[in-house]
Swiss-Prot record:
PANTHER family: 12S RRNA N4-METHYLCYTIDINE METHYLTRANSFERASE, S-ADENOSYL-METHYLTRANSFERASE MRAW. Its EC number is 2.1.1.199. It comes from the Bacteria. S-adenosyl-L-methionine binds at residues 32-34, 52, 79, 100, 107. One of its GO terms (cellular component) is cytoplasm. Specifically methylates the N4 position of cytidine in position 1402 (C1402) of 16S rRNA. NCBIfam families: 16S rRNA (cytosine(1402)-N(4))-methyltransferase RsmH. Coiled coil: none annotated. It comes from Bacillus mycoides (strain KBAB4). Belongs to the methyltransferase superfamily. RsmH family. This is Ribosomal RNA small subunit methyltransferase H.
Length: 310
């Protein structure tokens, strides 16, 4: 069963300021939590298009929301193709779009998917099971310099070089095939005092590899720009991020699109191409409540930002 505790459920959907007959997009269907709450607010004229790369998530949602008929449409695709896929459906603008960038719990909790450092499993980490690049390829084929870069940039791992040296030495003799093998090498690369603080020692490296395998940051940056273009004036974009790299992209993109660039003084009017596209609904991110954190530990790093098309 595809179970997943949805983070910031009401805040994210209510932040879209739902119009009952509007057209909305859930870019990250997952367990269908946000979609379920959103669909419950639509009348017969309303529609929700939901994206996911995971076939299990798609099939589960089709069964779960079958009573909504043509109001609910699934798209098995990476949300980097948001604009393209919506145009294929004959949709040129929408009333709101949401992103929940966390890895869904079923993916984390299914050992054979290779996302979790708590289970021994083949190194995979692909969100899209048909994609060619796996965690095995990254760990065994990428150069010392490439691994150090992603561990440091994507995982913000202080001991990137030490961990990569352990990986290099090990793979000279045999391939690193499982998450368990990789966890042991990560532990060896981190000094004992540092291992005792800051959560699981493999957390940052696993995050970095997952981001690299799925090209997550570039994909999100492209999709967020597409979302801003696809939303009609008065429509909104809600984004939940789970680490500082994603949040920085969201914050920067929203800020750039909501401010007027420096223009020569004395211009009688601001040319249309320089007018801000967005109005910020959240100046500072919305964080989970204490009650939500008690009920769902995975919500602790979540941040929600919302912007409205001008």
């Amino acid at each position: 069963m595809f179970k997943h505790v949805t983070v910031l459920l009401k805040e994210t959907v209510d932040g879209l300021d739902i119009k009952p007959s509007g057209t909305y997009v859930d870019c990250t269907l997952g367990g269908g939590g946000h979609s379920s709450y959103l669909l419950s607010q639509l009348t017969d004229g309303g529609k929700l298009i939901a994206f996911d790369q995971d076939e299990i998530a798609i099939q589960n949602a089709k069964e779960k929301f079958s009573s909504y008929g043509e109001q609910f449409v699934t798209v098995k695709s990476n949300f980097r193709y948001l604009s393209e896929k919506l145009h294929e459906l004959g949709i040129t603008e929408v009333d709101g779009i949401l992103f929940d960038l966390g890895v869904s719990s079923p993916q984390l909790d299914t050992p054979e998917r290779g996302f979790s450092y708590h289970h021994d499993a083949p190194l995979d980490m692909r969100m899209d099971q048909d994609a060619p690049l796996t965690a095995y390829d990254v760990v065994n084929s990428w150069s010392y310099e490439q691994l150090v870069r992603i561990f440091f940039q994507y995982g913000e791992e202080k001991f990137s070089k030490q961990i990569t040296r352990k990986i290099e030495a090990y793979r000279e003799n045999k391939a690193i095939e499982t998450t368990g093998e990789l966890v042991e090498l990560i532990k060896e690369g981190i000094p004992a005092p540092a291992r005792r603080t800051g959560g699981h020692p493999a957390k940052r490296v696993f995050q970095a590899i997952r981001i690299a395998v799925n090209d997550e940051l570039k994909v999100f940056e492209e999709a967020l720009e597409s979302a801003i273009d696809m939303v009609k004036p008065g429509g909104r974009v809600s984004v939940i991020t789970f680490h500082s790299l994603e949040d920085r992209i969201c914050k920067t993109t929203f800020k750039r699109n909501s401010t007027t660039p420096q223009l020569p003084q004395g211009l009688p009017i601001i040319p249309d191409e320089f007018k801000p596209k967005l109005k910020l609904i959240t100046r500072k991110p919305i964080l989970p409540s204490d009650i939500e954190l008690e009920e769902n530990n995975r919500a602790r790093s979540a941040k929600l930002r919302i912007a409205e098309k001008r």
